[in-house]
Amino acid sequence: MLVLTRKIGEAVTIGDQIRIMVVEVKGNQVRLGIEAPQDMRIYREEIYLQVQEENRHAADWNLTDLENAVSLLGSGDKE
């Protein structure tokens, strides 16, 4: 992990398209400004981890779930 020291108004550039600037420091909180392409997703880490967990949960299905779904689809009356 790269650890840098920055003052208010100073920035860090990542690659050619991402710039992170220290906007404000209050007590133990640091406010960051991030300039990045609009198509790049930027999340706070706790939100990112929550989304990952929800995705894992949604992808976690079992054979019984599939059999139940097939049964429901096949239970309609056919004439």
UniProtKB/Swiss-Prot annotation:
One of its GO terms (cellular component) is cytosol. It comes from the Bacteria. One of its GO terms (molecular function) is mRNA 5'-UTR binding. It is found in: Cytoplasm. Keywords: Bacterial flagellum biogenesis, Cytoplasm, Repressor, RNA-binding, Translation regulation. One of its GO terms (biological process) is regulation of carbohydrate metabolic process. Homodimer; the beta-strands of each monomer intercalate to form a hydrophobic core, while the alpha-helices form wings that extend away from the core. Belongs to the CsrA/RsmA family. A translational regulator that binds mRNA to regulate translation initiation and/or mRNA stability. Usually binds in the 5'-UTR at or near the Shine-Dalgarno sequence preventing ribosome-binding, thus repressing translation. Its main target seems to be the major flagellin gene, while its function is anatagonized by FliW. This is Translational regulator CsrA. The gene is csrA.
